[in-house]
Regions:
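Loop-to-helix entry region at the N-terminal start of transmembrane alpha-helices
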Residues: 10-21, 66-94, 134, 178, ...
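Transmembrane alpha-helix signature in integral membrane proteins
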Residues: 11-39
Length: 222
């Protein structure tokens, strides 16, 4: 803890790098996974193919992908793009499954009601299914973001890892306080981001909060 308190400026600089490497892939993954999930949800064959591909992608070891990517996309070994591209692939693989699960959680009667009042397929997806899937979607997003924050530290092995660089430096110089500082900083970062996402999810779904408040009253009336 002493090491962290005496190196706050370095911790802040590494945190900014860590956030950049963690959150840019989340934005890219969401931009791909949400439309893809909406597209394949009602197509059984495409859905199976998509989920199978996502499962295969996530089984690839992250360190191996970080090392191989420069040969595939023509970047330098120490280019942040390697970590961003790799984590974008992992994020998409995780999020597409989360999107499908979130859409599946929307009650069928609400879809039927939307059709009954004249919503077309696109309008139903955007105005009914997607908003109602937010609670499950945010739960999946929280898992993905925390996973990314942890996986960025693996990049420190190849010289790009944000707070993870304290791990490798600590091991190389046998400074346990530096390793502990990296662990504490990364844990704190994950907790803060997860809390913010949880709060954002609640603000985006006020009807869920209202339902939780009413439930005990209804139960007591019985």
């Amino acid at each position: 803890m002493h090491y962290l308190l005496t190196h706050l400026s370095t911790a802040w600089a590494l945190t900014v790098i860590h956030l950049r490497l963690s959150l840019i892939p989340v934005a890219i993954g969401l931009a791909i996974a949400v439309p893809l999930g909406l597209l394949v949800q009602r197509a059984p064959l495409l859905r199976r193919l998509t989920t199978a591909t996502a499962s295969v992608i996530f089984t690839i070891p992250s360190l191996a992908l970080f090392v191989v990517l420069p040969l595939v996309i023509g970047t330098r070994i120490l280019d942040e793009a390697n970590v961003i591209v790799a984590l974008s692939a992992y994020t998409t693989a995780l999020m597409v499954r989360a999107v499908l699960e979130a859409l599946d959680a929307v009650p069928g009667q609400l879809r039927d009601a939307a059709i009954a009042i004249g919503y077309g397929s696109l309008a139903r997806m955007l105005k009914v299914e997607l908003p109602l899937s937010i609670p499950v979607l945010v739960a999946g997003l929280r898992v993905v973001v925390v996973t990314n924050i942890a996986m960025v530290s693996v990049g420190s092995v190849i010289g790009i890892g944000g707070l993870g660089s304290w791990f490798t430096a600590g091991f190389q110089t046998n400074k346990s306080d530096q390793i502990v500082a990296g662990i504490i900083a990364m844990f704190a970062l994950a907790v803060v981001i997860d809390t913010l996402l949880s709060l954002a999810g609640r603000l985006a779904t006020p009807w869920e909060h209202g339902r939780r408040i009413r439930s005990p009253i209804v139960g007591g009336a019985r």
